[in-house]
Every structure is written in structure tokens, then in C-alpha cells.
Amino acid sequence: MLAYLCGPIEFTEDGGRLWRRKLAPFLRDQLGHRVYDPAEDEMKNLTEEEAAHFREWKTTDLDRFRRTVRKIIAFDLDLIENKADYLICYWPSENAHSGGTSAELTVAHRKGIPVYLVTPIAIDQVSGWMLACSDQLFTSIEGLKEFLAARFAREKQTQLWK
């Protein structure tokens, strides 16, 4: 099983890394799942030069920036479409900003890939698009962990009886 960790990266204080770093060991060690963390994989399909400079190109060379980010978009969406078994999206606050998150949720939804949305904010403050793309909604990472542990424990038991 491959879990894709989805959520704001670009405009967050920690680059969207902290929650992912806390959750990934549970997914790997407790569930035995593989994890793709786009916040940690900065190289993706980029050259060393692109990885090192694409952020500065946003203000100095917009065409080069677009070409590079389009490679990232293709890489991430291809991974979701062709390899991910489920997405976990963490939306930290009503002030969060992200362009890629909604696209990733939409691709997963259209492909029938389960989307687990975790957000501590009131449901009326969550984008309707994001809610519609999600299959399960959680108010905490701990609630998600309980759900996943139960969900995949049943799957492991089913495999034992085959």
C-alpha cells in the first residue's frame, strides 16, 4: 500500500514537513505501508539546477519557473493516478494556502482513490470542493490513526483467511 501525504507546502512555516514526519512512521511501522511525502522529495524529476533554483525563478524567470513546476505537477499527479492507494490530506487552518492540494484531491477522487481529510477547523470553513473529494473527515491525526489501524487490521485479517 502507498500513502500519498497531501497538504500545503509552499506557504507554510515548516514547508508542510512536521505533520508528515510525525505521521509517516506510524504508516510505515504500524501499518506496513509505503509513504510518499512530496515535501521531503524536493528532487522529484528535476535536474540539480532546477531543484536548487526554481523558487527564485518565480520572481526572476517566470517561464523557466513554469516549465519546472509543470514537471513537478506531472510527477506528483502521475504518482497519485498510477501508484497511490490512498491520500491523506492535512489542512491546518482556515488561512492555509495551496494550489496543488485541491488538484491532488480531485485527481484521487476521480480515480476512486480514497481520500482521508484531516482538519481541526470547523466544517463550514472547509472548502466544499475539498469536502466533496474526501471520503472520510477527521478532526485530528490521532482520529485518523485510529481509523486506519482498524481499517487495515481488518484487511490483514481477511488476508489470513484466504
Features from the language model and the residues they span:
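Conserved catalytic or regulatory cores that recognize and/or transform ribose-phosphate-containing ligands
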Residues: 1-162
